[in-house]
């Protein structure tokens, strides 16, 4: 038996979750947009996924959390739907093309054929742009990263022949969603004095990249049993690394060692970034770097308790449950009303 508590996080990476009022507000929105029928099962699915918001952004107020909840709604609904294989490759590509167009141009790709998810994504884009106000460079940075992420979904889901950790991590640099989540943290504070050019600083890029690796590592362990259950585990290193290093136990040791190394690098890069930063921007940069640490620590806390990953066959003790009230996410995702 294994435990997710084997992942060690510094104390300042962990905060109690924020108030969950935003989740119920956003659930009403997705029902109004007809993404879900309003019932107990869809609420449980929605809460079980979008509760990640209050863990990833624990210091944010209600208005900030609304933006973050809408962002994670788009991510989870789109990713779950495409991962579920309820669409064929052509339909998947078409949906991604339409969503990219909405984020890029702020309107619908085909005004004669508009799905509910397209309507919601446009609503999310418009409300987020309004929230950011004049800091359009923050908004544009977010658009770049979410478009990159959307375009990474299908290639990763269909990369069923991954057989080495380097190739996997190259995919996960974008597909983990950490760059997008961090850019969301940046636009949640539109009054920040941080220079958007921080994103082209190679040390900050490595800082964010390692954050992506850490989140992917945590998610791989948390979602392992769920992915086996749905035959989506071929791209999970807990599976494919067994062909190289032997037992699950050996693979888990490799992953924990990798996790410790990248977390140490994150801390060291943050120290140097703050040291080199102009004094007038230092507090804002510190807010941004701590935001990423809270995203990673929050993802860990959420993974320990969320119903999304519960499976009696999980190798991790925190996720084992026979609770009949726990609804596997794939029992709901096929009810998403994308058409």
From Swiss-Prot:
Q: What task does this protein carry out?
A: Terpene synthase that converts its substrate farnesyl diphosphate (FPP) into the sesquiterpene beta-barbatene as a major product as well as (E)-beta-farnesene as a minor product. Is also able to convert geranyl diphosphate (GPP) into a mixture of monoterpenes including (Z)-beta-ocimene, linalool, beta-myrcene, limonene and alpha-terpineol.
Q: Name one GO molecular function term.
A: (+)-beta-barbatene synthase activity
Q: What induces it?
A: Expression is almost undetectable in vegetatively growing cells and increases during development induced by starvation. Expression is highest during he ultimate stage of mature fruiting body (approximately 24 hours after induction).
From the UniProt record, list the reaction(s) this protein catalyses: (2E,6E)-farnesyl diphosphate = (-)-beta-barbatene + diphosphate; (2E,6E)-farnesyl diphosphate = (E)-beta-farnesene + diphosphate; (2E)-geranyl diphosphate = (Z)-beta-ocimene + diphosphate; (2E)-geranyl diphosphate + H2O = linalool + diphosphate
Q: Where is this motif: DDxx(x)D/E motif?
A: 79-84
UniProt note: domains: Contains several highly conserved motifs that are important for catalytic activity including the aspartate-rich 'DDxx(x)D/E' motif and the 'NDxxSxxxD/E' motif, both of which are involved in complexing metal ions to coordinate the binding of the isoprenyl diphosphate substrate in the active site.
EC main class here is lyase
Motif NDxxSxxxD/E motif: chain residues: 219-227
Similarity comment text for this entry: Belongs to the terpene synthase family.
What is one Gene Ontology biological process annotated in the Swiss-Prot or TrEMBL record?
sesquiterpene biosynthetic process
Family matches, as InterPro entries = Isoprenoid_synthase_dom_sf, Terpene_cyclase-like_2
What the entry lists under Pfam families is as follows: Terpene_syn_C_2 (PF19086)
Identify the domain of life: Eukaryota
User: Which protein is depicted?
Assistant: Terpene synthase 9
Q: Which UniProt keywords apply?
A: Lyase, Metal-binding
Q: Which Gene3D superfamilies match?
A: Farnesyl Diphosphate Synthase (1.10.600.10)
Q: What is its EC number?
A: 4.2.3.-, 4.2.3.15, 4.2.3.47
């Amino acid at each position: 038996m294994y435990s997710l508590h084997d992942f060690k996080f510094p104390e300042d990476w962990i905060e109690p979750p924020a108030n969950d009022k935003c989740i119920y507000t956003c659930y009403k929105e997705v029902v109004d947009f007809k993404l879900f029928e309003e019932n107990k099962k869809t609420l449980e699915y929605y809460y079980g996924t979008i509760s990640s918001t209050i863990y990833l952004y624990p210091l944010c107020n209600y208005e900030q959390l609304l933006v973050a909840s809408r962002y994670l709604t788009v991510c989870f609904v789109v990713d779950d739907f495409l991962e579920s294989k309820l669409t064929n490759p052509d339909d998947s590509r078409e949906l991604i093309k339409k969503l990219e167009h909405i984020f890029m141009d702020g309107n619908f790709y085909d005004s004669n054929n508009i799905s509910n998810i397209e309507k919601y994504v446009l609503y999310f884009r418009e409300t987020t742009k309004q929230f950011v106000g004049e800091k359009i460079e923050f908004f544009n940075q977010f658009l770049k990263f979410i478009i990159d992420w959307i375009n990474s979904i299908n290639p990763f889901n269909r990369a069923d022949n991954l057989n080495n950790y380097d190739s996997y991590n190259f995919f996960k640099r974008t597909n983990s969603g950490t760059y997008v989540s961090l850019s969301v943290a940046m636009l949640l504070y539109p009054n920040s004095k941080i220079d958007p050019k921080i994103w082209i600083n190679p040390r900050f890029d490595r800082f964010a990249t390692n954050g992506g690796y850490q989140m992917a590592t945590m998610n791989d362990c948390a979602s392992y049993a769920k992915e086996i259950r749905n035959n989506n585990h071929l791209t999970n290193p807990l599976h494919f690394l067994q062909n190289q290093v032997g037992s699950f136990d050996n693979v888990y040791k490799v992953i924990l060692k990798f996790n410790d190394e990248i977390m140490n690098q994150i801390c060291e890069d943050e120290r140097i970034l703050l040291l080199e930063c102009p004094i007038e921007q230092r507090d804002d940069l510190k807010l941004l770097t701590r935001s990423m640490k809270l995203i990673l620590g929050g993802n860990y806390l959420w993974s320990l308790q969320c119903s999304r990953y519960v499976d009696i066959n999980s190798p991790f003790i925190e996720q084992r449950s026979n609770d009949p009230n726990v609804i596997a996410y794939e029992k709901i995702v096929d009810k998403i009303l994308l058409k």
